[in-house]
Amino acid sequence: MHKTKIVTTFLINSDKILLLKRSQKVKSMKNLWAGISGIIEGDEKPVKRAKIEVYEEVGIEESNIKLIKEGDVILIESPQYENHQWEVYPFLFSCDNREVKLNWENSESKLISLNELNNFTTVPSLDKVLTRLF
């Protein structure tokens, strides 16, 4: 089975978490709601990749976020690819900034309460990733 290591990062502000809607331009999981995600490159530290992705996807610099929790790694079967798993490294950062500057990977953003997650069509097992952080 092939595994891809990725980070999935959530920003929290006043008990609201940031969700992003993946755009039509990305390779996988188009138009599904997700956290801030990215592939871990080589022997890169997952927390480093998480901070890079926050800046790339929503324009918030490392100095404006604070790590609250690094969740346990979770393996998620890929519905898109046969014999493939995502090895997900979950992160939760606090952030006072409510303004985001989306890049091409996402088309929309929303700050939601955890109990609102079921109202969104998300990437597979996003709820399970979140339970690693709360």
Which sequence ranges carry the predicted segments?
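Active-site-adjacent beta-strand/loop module that shapes the phosphate/pyrophosphate-binding cleft
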Residues: T4, N13-D15, G71-E99, K110
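A short coil-to-beta-strand element that immediately follows conserved catalytic motifs
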Residues: E61-G71
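Conserved Nudix-box catalytic region and its N-terminal flanking loop in Nudix hydrolases
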Residues: K16-E57
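Glycine-rich, flexible loop/turn motifs
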Residues: M29, I36, D96-R98, E108
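Conserved N-terminal beta-strand and adjoining loop/helix that marks the start
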Residues: M1-L18, I39
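NUDIX/MutT-family hydrolases
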Residues: P90-S94, K101-R132
